[in-house]
UniProtKB/Swiss-Prot annotation:
The lineage of its organism: Bacteria, Bacillati, Actinomycetota, Actinomycetes, Micromonosporales. The record marks 373 as: Required for activity. It comes from Salinispora arenicola (strain CNS-205). It catalyses: ATP + H2O + 4 H(+)(in) = ADP + phosphate + 5 H(+)(out). Belongs to the ATPase alpha/beta chains family. It comes from the Bacteria. F-type ATPases have 2 components, CF(1) - the catalytic core - and CF(0) - the membrane proton channel. CF(1) has five subunits: alpha(3), beta(3), gamma(1), delta(1), epsilon(1). CF(0) has three main subunits: a(1), b(2) and c(9-12). The alpha and beta chains form an alternating ring which encloses part of the gamma chain. CF(1) is attached to CF(0) by a central stalk formed by the gamma and epsilon chains, while a peripheral stalk is formed by the delta and b chains. Residues 514-550 are annotated as: Disordered. Keywords: ATP synthesis, ATP-binding, Cell membrane, CF(1), Hydrogen ion transport, Ion transport, Membrane, Nucleotide-binding, Translocase, Transport. This is ATP synthase subunit alpha. It is an enzyme of class 7 (translocase).
Amino acid sequence: MAELTISTEEIRGALERYVSSYTADVSREEVGTVADAGDGIAHVEGLPSTMTNELLEFEDGTLGVALNLDVREIGVVVLGDFGGIEEGQRVKRTGRVLSAPVGDAFLGRVVNALGHPIDGLGDIANEGFRELELQAPNVMARKSVDEPLQTGIKAVDAMTPIGRGQRQLIIGDRKTGKTTVALDTILNQRDNWRSGDPKKQVRCIYVAVGQKASTIASIKGVLEEAGAMEYTTIVASPASDPAGFKYLAPYTGSTIGQHWMYGGKHVLVVFDDLSKQAEAYRAVSLLLRRPPGREAYPGDVFYLHSRLLERCAKLSDEMGGGSMTGLPIIETKANDISAFIPTNVISITDGQIFLETDLFNQGVRPAINVGTSVSRVGGAAQVKPMKKVAGSLRLNLAQYRELEAFAAFASDLDKASRAQLERGSRLVELLKQPNYSPFPVEEQVVSVWAGTEGRLDDIPVGEIRRFESEFLQYLRHKHEGVLAGIAAGTWGDEIIASLDAAISDFKNLFLGKEDEQRVNEPPAKPLAGEENRETVTRFRDGTTDRPAES
């Protein structure tokens, strides 16, 4: 019988091979339970290793984001339908921090606060994900604002110019045209986009927070009709969305824009509006049982907006030279810009455009209050011709408003004051502009030059806008080289002389045509009781003798 031999080396090798090839089928995951849920908020017990802003998954697949990390429980904002979440259900960690998909495929699309498409055009092929809570560029990564972002609005580009990388607040009561100013700015980027020049192209993001779904649909229709959706992304969180979505939507829009900014591209982001985001954040914070402060807002409501708007920047050449311009919108109550949220955002931004209800009701649109509107850094980026002609415009309008208020009570004014009132009324008329009809910068320069230099003083106030329209058309056909020179940034004696000659020639044609129309019009029949008004008026002006007494 053969002797049994045991080789320890073989046994050890067999065991090592078995152990090295073994794969455990058991997965490790942290699981917690829902302590209570309601109003879009859930309090979860357990999960001690959860990170701030980490995504958590409920039993029905709904996601939530961890905002409050207390010793015993976690405060979670539910991102979706919270009707199926009940006490006692299991919650597990995902290990992922809240992020949004980004990429060029988002242009022309409408997405929700999580970056998911809601326009029915299918999935979006993203280029990756970016965290929503990324640090803003530091001081060394930035450079000063030195490139203009033209809005196409004469009053804005002349008096409160905006530069690429600037944060310019649009503030005013409801129904004063705040959204219209922002949409005009988006529409004015169309020619730059179609030029194909990456240095001129501006990608636009419109963030709609707390608006009616029908309003968002109409805004999309305006952009599509003007051909602006091809370079615009809409991030929509309508009034029907939970408060958590309204709180996150501006960060999603900013994240999509940051992807392009760090890629060396230029971006414009409109936040419409941050008042509703602050209200949504207040609701979320109170439901999370955070201590309330002034007007029941949480103590970090300033940080809510500062960390969002600080992401707007003009990057240095070493960082690619991209930019992200922010146009936050804030709604005031009774024109009170000293309220809590308005003063917060005013202190964060680089200037504000204040739209006033009284001016809007008077037909001055855009209804910009010159006295309280300012741009702190955009002047450095203003084009040279506009800077030359618009220097006195703000002062003239401010003096006109002051004199207008005085003239309402004064019976007689000196000649200089009357002349100032006449010119001021023409400047106000000149700066009026229809909705969704932005002006090229060279035509803005011509209009502002004509008004500030007194070339319109002999044109009736009611005819100013018609004169402007026809004169610009005349220049486009007869003096195209002058407009091209201004567009190229040229301004000097030669261009001024050409404009002087052109406006004199056109004025003769315009006034001659007007006189001819007046002659051909049949005399208007006086209304009852007005037969003697002309005589009385002429007597008051001193142009006729006193009527004989009976």
